[in-house]
Amino acid sequence: PFELEREPAEAPEEPLPAPELHSLYHREHSGLRSKTLPTLRIALLGNPNCGKTSLFNQASGAHEHVGNYSGVTIEAKTGYIYYGGYRIELIDLPGSYSLSPYSPEEIYIRNYLTGSQRPDLVLNVVDTCNIERNLYLTLQLKELGLPVVVALNMFDEFMQREEYFDYPRLSRLLGIPMIPTICRTGLGLEALFDEIISVAKGIKAGDESLFSPETGK
């Protein structure tokens, strides 16, 4: 199993930014303007109870049920936000511990991530308090070759344990951006979506299949 060296922290005094959430996700792009924005399809994926659906609700303004029992997210939920000049489609996939095709949820997720409608990027939400267990799924996503950004969620609870790990170093080792978040309040989401836009812009510059103007409804 993946293990991290933990040590008592000289933790940063302000580990998370505190943005005004309402200023982040502009939903004023209505009518024809929204239909001409480039679309970025992002799949939300993480272990059960990692805070993934809380992130979905905070970002999209949706009110999906959030609970601590199996089967809360039994199918993909979709929400939309407009940020950084893009129309972002958020797909909240079922919670899963792995991509091994054993359970119906795992088969559904793997087929979605590798099929013709696969997302442009995967936002992997992890419970920072259980980082080793959560990284198993992260490494499987990396093996699929999809662009990944990690939200280190519940970072406040992790810091309360007076532990710290060098997540910038881990990010460099894995080649995956990692951003601390507190999804239930929205803290860290501005930095997270800025990173997502940055990664998306850097993916194969000139690849027209990544961003396609919205031509639907």
Where are the predicted features?
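Conserved C-terminal guanine-recognition region of P-loop GTPase G domains, centered on the G4
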Residues: 79-85, 108-179
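Extracytoplasmic
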Residues: 212-217
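Conserved nucleotide-binding/hydrolysis micro-motifs of P-loop NTPases
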Residues: 71, 95-96, 128-132, 154-159, ...
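Helical mechanochemical/support elements of P-loop NTPase systems and associated helical scaffolds
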Residues: 70-77, 89, 101, 105-108, ...
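Conserved G1/Walker A P-loop phosphate-binding module
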Residues: 2-103, 115-121
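Glycine-centered helix-boundary capping/hinge motifs
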Residues: 60-61, 145, 175, 186
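Canonical P-loop GTPase G-domain recognition
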Residues: 156-211
